[in-house]
Every structure is written in C-alpha cells, then in structure tokens.
Amino acid sequence: MLDIKFVRDNPDAVKENIKKKFQDAKLPLVDEVIEKDAKYRECLKEVESLKAARNKLSKANGPLFGQLKKCDDEAKKAELQAQIDANNAAVKADADKMAELEAEEAKLAERIQEIMYTIPQMIDPSVPIGPDDTYNVEAQRFGEPVVPDFPIPYHTEIMESFDGIDMDAAGRVAGNGFYYLLGNIARLHEAVLAYARDFMIDKGFTYVILPFMMHGNVVQGVMSFPEMDAMMYKIEGEDLYLIGTSEHTMIGRFIDQTLDEATLPLTLTSYSPCFRKEKGAHGIEERGIYRIHQFEKQEMIVVCRPEESADWYEKLWKNSVELFRSMEIPVRQLNCCSGDLADLKVKSCDIEAWSPRQQKYFEVCSCSNLGDAQARRLHIRVKGKDGKTYLAHTLNNTCVAPPRMLIAFLENHLQADGSVTIPKVLQPYMGGLEVMVPVHKK
C-alpha cells in the first residue's frame, strides 16, 4: 500500500505504474482518492476550527458565570444570562456541525482506505513489463537439465510404485485437492522439510513455530483483496482464517509494533501446513499434487531497513537455488513481469525446477520484496538511533514446498529400473537410505 502523500504528490507516476501493471480500470481511482483526500483534510481542518471555537465559547462562560453569581442588578443579570445562553447555543450548534463533519470524515476515510488498498505498490524499475506470466524473463540457470533415455511416468504413478500415495481415499474423505502420502514417500516428504529447516537454521535464520490461523485484519495486512478471495479459507462464525502460507503469521507477529533498529534484520524461517482454495484460472488438478488445497512448506521471511531490502532479496532467492542444487535438482531463476506481480509486491522472481518428464521447468519457489507495503498496512515501524520512526521493509521466499519439490525430486532421481536415488544431504534424514526400491515395478 502506498503513502497517500506520495499519491498526492506523484499522481502521474502512480498512474504510469498502474498502466505498467495492465490495470487501466484502476486509473480513475487515483483522481478519486486525491479528491477524497482533499475533502477529508478539509473536514479535519473544519473540525479543528469548530473545536477551537467551542473551547473559546466554553471558556468565555466561566467569567460570565462568576459575574452572574455576584451581580445584584436584575437587568445586568438578564444580560449576562442571555450571553451565557447564546454561547451555549453556539456551542451546541458547533457540536452538531462537528458531528456531521466527523461522520463525513469517517465515510471519506473508509473510502480512501478502500482505494489505497486497491492501488498497486510501485514496482522496481528492473521488473520486466508484460501483462501475464508468459512475459516472465529467465535470468539464470543452475545445473544441467536431465534428459533421460527412458520414459518418465507421471509423478503419481512413480509414487504408486512405492505404495506411497492414495488420492482415491483422500477424495472420498475430503474431495479433490487432497492426498495421503505413505511409507517412503511420506518419509521423503518429511526428510525434505527437516533438511530445509536445518539448512535455514545454518544460514542464521531463527526457527519459528507459529499460529496456523489469523484474524481478518492480519489477512488484509499481508495480501491484496484478489489474493485473499482466491486463497483464504474462513472459519465460519469466527474472525479467523486458515493461513495460505506461514509468511502470513510470521509477518503478522509484528503488527502494531515499533522495532528497535538495532534488532534488524529479523530473519525467520518456519514450517507450516498451508490451506488454499485455489480459485481462479488454474484451479485444482483432477489428479496429481502440483496444485492442491493443503500442503506443507518451509518458508523464510526478513524484516529489515529499507536500504537493505534489495540485498536481502538477492540472498533469499539464492538460498532456494542452493537448497535445490544440494539435492541435485536443476533449477532456473525467472524474473516475474509487472502483470504477474501481486499488488503489494515491488519485485518478485520464481525458482523453477527442471521436469525431465515434460522437458521444461515448473515453479517450485517464489521470492518477493514487498517494500513497505505490508509494514504500512500492519503498522510495523522501526525506531532509529535518532529516535525517529520509519516503516520497515518485508520480504518472503519459499524455502521448499514438498508437494512440488517431490515431483521434481522423483523425476530427477528416478532410475531406469524404477528406483529413486537419495542425495547425500538427505540420507541422514532417511535413516541412511541411499536408494528407494519400488514395491511395484511397471
């Protein structure tokens, strides 16, 4: 979310940014919010003026009451009483006018906030311009893509060969978008999460166990309305939502806080289940675990000073690359274009893993710099050495999300005989197992 003062002072830049994000329908909102803000500030000014007048009249009545009490002249007493009554009438009139203005002020403030929540964050100059993800730009590749000389089955078929997945039972229990993982596949899932946790701790991040639900004001603080509608499950009858990712409550931890600058940067990592409706263009897969309603994830976030966020952005996505390469999975970095950025994001990139079966890359991680957008909504401020406060910057990045990571892992480590090799970094988390041998060979 932008600062209203910035919008007031830079309307053309804000409009140009909206055009770069291909959201032209929002252009009239810039002029509307500037107009509403001017009216809001005029209301504030009038209210303050009326308060001053009311206080002056109320103060004037004090001496008049004193004179009235001491006065013996009936004519003079009547004159004093008339002045007191006139002052009281003026005070009441001012109070009535103030009530009207304050009601208008509240109405304007609500609309201003609604618009400000809709106007997108200013994107970084380095962001590629394009309307959708087909305009995302490959930046770098890491590792040589695997080109197998044998056919790679669909990932659920690989899992089924290990008796490792039961989607039919999950469908009977909860419908599409859920799964049971079993045996070595379930063990591999947990091994990846445990390894990712230790990997991030070794990077100096603090491990966090956090709430898996949050209040509506936190939801509005961490994401845009379209994201909220497409993703979040609400608990019926409660002001609670299931988290779509652990970054939500990791960032939410600092709502309405003023942080000591000396404590920054705050670098946190957490495991959590994630719950998503997955409404929209992609939806839930009829089969497979690429896009589902419930999954687990290891996440990383940073709360830092504004001048540090660009450097942390680079560090975060490189953590994901290093993690995947340590598990011998080829990946690439893809810079997200303007139209593919959520409204709160300043800059974002995807880390995509190589799929030997499809002979193409697919998204496994997403890294984002949100600038001061979340901090402004959640009121996360920093107190500097000079005593002045300013808004923090926040960033987040997927460390690993095992459902998608498992797809990449199984395809890249599948052998011609149907077995799956375990990289050395994961073997301690798999009880020393070096190779997973299928139960059913096809």
Regions found by a protein language model. Name each.
Residues 27, 141-442:
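TRNA-recognition modules of translation machinery and tRNA-sensing kinases, especially anticodon-binding
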Residues 1-145, 160, 164:
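N-terminal alpha-helical targeting/anchoring segments
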